[in-house]
């Protein structure tokens, strides 16, 4: 039936993203361990490969504690409000020619608009927790998002002007001859601006003021535990992956590469990983 075919693509994309998030967290922990002369997660499964699954089960079974002074409706709703925009950004990303959920004519505008909506859930989490550290973290987040939004838009505007389209698939196809990152001066400047703005959007070093461990502990999520904490983590890493996909699509030719078109998603994932490493 027609309604079933409309659900298949979102279902597949969501499951792929959840799988990527699961093992990117493991990869990050492994990298951090190596940098500190440690082994990292190693006990669950061969070489610790099943550690993310064990962590997910642990979070699902943990008690859901709500602070006595919290604003319960806001506190409980915040993780979902935070997660939805982080997942919705994948709706317009084409992973290969004709392979995606919805290739909109205003794809880049949709991505920019939806990705900025995560601040609503983030602010709800800080406000609803009724915790001074969480609230201070959300206030910093609002200031930071106001700061990075304009550079992010200006950086994304360069590929849009070079391709002459807001449609993400058109931007990818316009790079068949030359990736936009290799355009003299303007391509490199736009890419550097995009990376810096994305680091700020993802709250990564040196823009991790939202959860500065030395003063704010876990930032806006300090009062969350169990499944709610897992949902917030899922949204945060999904946003990182989505921004990495967008960077590969805007500047690195997306799925264009040697070999048959069937290898397009492989090249796209490879460039996404390159962009992801720059975020860490």
Language-model features: locations:
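Juxtamembrane inter-helical linkers in multi-pass membrane proteins
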Residues: 33-56, 141, 145, 204-229
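Juxtamembrane/interfacial segments at transmembrane-helix boundaries in multi-pass membrane proteins
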Residues: 1, 97-110, 154-190, 261
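Alpha-helical transmembrane segments
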Residues: 9-17, 105-116, 180-199, 265-272
